[in-house]
Design a protein with these regions (language model features):
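Symmetry-related core transmembrane helices of the 12-TM Major Facilitator Superfamily/SLC fold
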Residues: 170-185, 368-383
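Intracellular juxtamembrane helix-capping segments at the cytosolic ends
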Residues: 119-132, 314-328
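Helix-breaking motifs and short loop linkers at transmembrane-helix boundaries and internal kinks
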Residues: 78, 99-101, 273, 295-297
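Paired small-residue
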Residues: 104-112, 300-308
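Helix-loop boundary and gating motifs at the non-cytosolic
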Residues: 11-60, 215, 227-236, 240
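Cytoplasmic helix-loop-helix junction between adjacent transmembrane helices
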Residues: 111-146
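Helix-to-loop junctions at the C-terminal end of transmembrane segments
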Residues: 66-78, 163, 261-273, 359
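Structural signature of the two symmetry-related core transmembrane helices
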Residues: 81-95, 276-290, 372
């Protein structure tokens, strides 16, 4: 029976889904562990939130730089091969961080690591979107986001256990990225449907963004919210007086919120409508920073708010992917997903940089003001689009 599951053609689609989901969740776990470790080490090196924010922007710049080329890479290279190569490349950069403790060098290393991670996520998410049945797409993407958030939560817990100093967190991160190759190698099934030359072009990506602007906006806001959370909220926690272990639990609470919310949000999106749930999630993103401010340094209140805030905000990623899966098919999904990830990269670039400046001007609450303002901007965009579509 077990051999039949591993080898039987009837289970190939499920094996591919499982391998893509496990791979991405391990990658997410490594990301969530190392982002706060990098931020806390940079804070110790420089004492500047601006340096932390700008350095965190390296990963976003790499996403913007490589995302337009991923469809072309997937046109020439089988998806499984590209994912394995990217995971190993990311793993090999990790030991260089503690060996070369310099903010400028870390910027370069994070750029290289970010390119590899971007290729993994564009490939794996396209793979899931192509395989998922249309009627259950948001639910399956919710399950994927749940597994990804589980990886994020595990990364936060690992930070609480391992701390941010010494070699332990770096070695753990290396093992996580390298381990992501195992399900790709062991679980065989349908691969990624490769795009044709026209679908892989830059112009096709621009057209895809124009065809699904709500999805692109969701990626933009999620990129800003998520990366700011992992890059600067550890610094926020430090500046309001939380010890390292409480910061780790705060990060874990936010990531675990993603586990609790993604599948319900996916089911609601399949039943009620993706745009309605997107509006709800965006409103929660606008309100969340105010509740974080009101929580102060009370750990219990802060953990509870982070659980809901980050959990619902993560839903923007699920919803954006579901909208892409609804509007595109086959190889064209690669290009649309690349546009979505590129928008995520732009958000990841702008969010920490702007929030870092805000944090320096209004220490430390400028971070919360910027986070809320970005969500309100996207909520206004959704409202204007709805008014434009309403018949006169």
């Amino acid at each position: 029976m077990i051999a039949g599951w591993f080898l039987g053609a009837e289970h190939g689609r499920l094996r591919s889904l499982i391998s893509a989901i496990i791979c991405a969740s391990l990658c997410g776990c490594g990301f969530t562990l190392l982002m706060p470790v990098m931020s806390l080490n940079l804070e110790a090196m420089t004492g500047s939130a601006i340096v932390v924010g700008v350095n965190s922007a390296a990963a976003a710049l790499s996403t913007i730089a490589i995302a337009p080329f991923v469809p072309r890479l997937l046109r020439r290279i089988p998806g499984r091969t590209l994912i394995i190569f990217s995971l190993l490349s990311a793993a090999l950069t990790i030991p260089l961080f503690p060996l070369l403790p310099d903010p400028t060098i870390w910027f370069i290393l994070r750029f290289a690591m970010g390119m590899a991670i971007t290729a993994v996520f564009v490939s794996s998410e396209t793979w899931i979107n192509q395989i998922a049945p249309a009627g259950k797409r948001a639910t399956i993407l919710g399950l994927y986001a749940t597994a990804l958030a589980g990886g994020f939560g595990a990364g936060g817990l690992m930070l609480a256990v391992l701390g941010s100093t010494g070699w332990a967190p770096w070695i753990a991160g290396l093992c996580l990225f390298a381990g992501g190759t195992l399900p790709i190698l062991l679980l065989r099934g349908p691969g990624i449907e490769q795009p044709d030359s026209e679908s892989a072009s830059f112009s096709a990506m621009i057209k895809a963004a124009g065809y699904a602007p709500a999805a692109i906006g969701a990626g933009l806001l999620f990129g800003a919210t998520e990366t700011t959370f992992f890059a600067l909220f550890p610094v926020y926690g430090d500046r309001i007086g939380l010890p390292d272990h409480s910061i780790g639990y705060m990060m874990a609470a936010g990531a675990l919120g993603g586990i609790a919310f993604q599948t319900p949000l996916g089911r609601l999106a399949d039943k009620i409508g993706r745009m309605q749930i997107t509006v709800f999630a965006t409103a929660a993103c606008a309100l969340g920073p105010l509740l974080i401010y009101l929580s102060g340094a009370n750990p219990v209140a802060l953990y509870a708010v982070m659980f809901v805030y980050v959990g619902v905000a993560t839903g923007l990623y699920t919803l954006g992917l579901a909208i892409i899966g609804e509007r595109f098919e086959g190889g064209s999904m690669v290009t649309a997903n690349a546009a979505f990830i590129m928008a995520y990269g732009v958000g990841s670039l702008a969010g920490p940089a702007i929030s870092g400046v805000g944090m320096e001007i209004i220490n430390p609450y400028g971070l919360l003001i910027v986070s809320s303002a970005l969500a309100l901007g996207y909520l206004l965009f959704l409202g204007l689009r709805k008014l434009q579509r309403r018949p006169a």
